[in-house]
């Protein structure tokens, strides 16, 4: 997982409220188990409109998506986060998120930023013509016009995103501690160790 430090670029001024995961990635795309190519299915129904914002050359490869309240509601599907990543989105800014979507986004290295509606409205305005910047360390969203919006983030999530640590990475980072614990267990509970060794050898 790539570390998240600063994200800067044009932001897609989407702004729609109550966008569920079926809008983000339709169910027919869930048959795949690979993450590559899912960007083509992202917001597929909305892309039927030839004037849709997602196919606009102006916002091609934009790393930030500005959304409305309750983004990512509906059924749980990690493919929604995969699809956004495949589009090039590294952060989503919205007034609120579905808890499940927020968790899936975090596990896949997407930063979810919660800001009040007034800030969203201002960013939507700026995004029409100018870039937006997110600084994870400072926990701020800024614009070229001296706008500065602060956001809160769970310290654990911040640490993981800043260091590019997913669940596997976190486990590997504590490899020495795990090995030490296993050695102690073998000494203090040898009868359990025998069972573990038998399973490992099978």
UniProtKB/Swiss-Prot annotation:
Q: Which UniProt keywords apply?
A: Amino-acid biosynthesis, Branched-chain amino acid biosynthesis, Leucine biosynthesis, Lyase
InterPro entries from the UniProt entry: 3-IsopropMal_deHydase_ssu, Aconitase/3IPM_dehydase_swvl, AconitaseA/IPMdHydase_ssu_swvl, IPMI_Swivel, LeuD
Does the keyword section mention Cell division?
no
Q: Listed GO molecular functions?
A: 3-isopropylmalate dehydratase activity
Keyword Amino-acid biosynthesis assigned to the entry: answer is yes
The record ties this protein, via Pfam families, to: Aconitase_C
Q: So what does this thing catalyse?
A: (2R,3S)-3-isopropylmalate = (2S)-2-isopropylmalate
Describe which pathway this protein belongs to, using the record's wording: Amino-acid biosynthesis; L-leucine biosynthesis; L-leucine from 3-methyl-2-oxobutanoate: step 2/4
**Known EC number:** 4.2.1.33
In the UniProt record, which is one GO cellular component term? 3-isopropylmalate dehydratase complex
GO BP annotations listed: L-leucine biosynthetic process
What highest taxon heads this organism's lineage? Bacteria
Quaternary structure note: Heterodimer of LeuC and LeuD.
Q: What does this protein do?
A: Catalyzes the isomerization between 2-isopropylmalate and 3-isopropylmalate, via the formation of 2-isopropylmaleate.
Which HAMAP family does this one have? LeuD_type1 (MF_01031)
- Stated family: Belongs to the LeuD family. LeuD type 1 subfamily.
Protein name listed in UniProt: 3-isopropylmalate dehydratase small subunit
Source organism (scientific name): Novosphingobium aromaticivorans (strain ATCC 700278 / DSM 12444 / CCUG 56034 / CIP 105152 / NBRC 16084 / F199)
Report which gene this protein is encoded by.
leuD
């Amino acid at each position: 997982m790539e570390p998240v430090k600063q994200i800067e670029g044009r932001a897609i001024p989407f702004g729609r409220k109550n966008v569920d995961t079926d809008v983000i990635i339709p169910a027919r795309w869930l048959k795949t188990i690979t993450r590559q190519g899912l960007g083509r299915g992202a917001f597929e129904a909305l892309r039927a409109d030839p004037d849709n914002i997602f196919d606009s050359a102006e916002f091609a490869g934009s790393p930030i998506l500005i959304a409305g309240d309750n983004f990512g509601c509906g059924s749980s599907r990690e493919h929604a986060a995969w699809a956004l990543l495949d589009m090039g989105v590294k952060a989503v800014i919205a007034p609120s998120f579905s808890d499940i979507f927020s968790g899936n986004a975090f596990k896949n290295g997407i930063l979810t930023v919660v800001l009040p509606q007034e800030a969203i409205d201002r960013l939507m305005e700026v995004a029409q013509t100018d870039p937006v910047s997110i600084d994870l360390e400072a926990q701020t969203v800024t614009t070229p016009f001296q706008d500065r919006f602060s956001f809160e983030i769970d310290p654990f999530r911040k640490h993981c995103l800043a260091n590019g640590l997913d669940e596997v990475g976190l486990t590997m980072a504590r490899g020495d501690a795990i090995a030490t614990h296993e050695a102690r267990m073998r000494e203090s509970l040898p009868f359990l160790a025998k069972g573990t060794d038998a399973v490992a050898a099978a």
